[in-house]
Amino acid sequence: MKTVIMAGGKGTRISTIAHEIPKPMIPVEGKPVLEHELESLREQGFVDVLITVSHLGDKIMAYFGDGSGISPATGKPFGVHIEYYVEKEPLGNAGALFKIRDKLDEDFLLLNADALFDVDFRRFVAFHETHGGLVTLFTHPNSHPYDSGLIVADERGAVMQWLAKEEAHPRYYHNRVNAGLHILKPEVLDRTGIDPLTVGTLGRNGKPVKVDLDRQIGRASCRERV
């Protein structure tokens, strides 16, 4: 199964302390966060990786290359095969998926590039295949649900609503937060009604059209940048 890692964010919240390196390259225990992710994937047999990059993406590409080289941090092979998609303009947190649609011919893992996790990906994939959803999200409780995006699901685990952290939360809710790990069937991109040729082009306000898929599952938000 291919893994797509989204590494195109600007990391504005940490820019005051790490403005010269992209957030996925911040070192934790001597190596970049993204390297921890790739190690976890490799150890579980997920070695076909496509990374979307934008802001300071050249630093990510220079460090990892195509994945066939040696880690400067560990002195060991990365042991994965890496391709890149470079966003010339920010496309939103899902816009790049429409640009690489031709490379996605089967279900794929979709990960954020700036998270540390200890996850059994094979078990995650097995759950996805058993339940047959277009999208499967990995969720978890956290210590600050009041300012986090929340997943509202029914008793069977089917996602009913995705509440962004900016939106009003119900008074009573389950502490279930999106972990930034997903499995998608590629056809979900075809069901959004978004023309991939418009993503990144200039909209009515003269700014690039961006796409976000972080509001409701199966309902994309296509908007012009403001």
Predicted features by range, described:
Residues V152-A158:
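Short acidic-glycine loop/turn motifs at beta-strand connectors
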Residues P27, T139, V152, I183-K185:
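Short, well-ordered beta-strand micro-motif
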Residues I14, I60-F64, T192:
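Hydrophobic packing residues within well-ordered alpha-helices of enzyme cores
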Residues F108-L109, L116, R122-E129, N142-P145, ...:
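Catalytic-core segments of class I nucleotidyltransferases/pyrophosphorylases
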Residues K2-I5, P27-R123:
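Conserved N-terminal catalytic core of the sugar/cofactor nucleotidyltransferase
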Residues H131-P141:
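A short, conserved acidic/glycine-rich loop-to-beta-strand motif
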Residues M1-A18, M25:
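N-proximal low-complexity "stem/linker" segments adjacent to membrane-targeting elements
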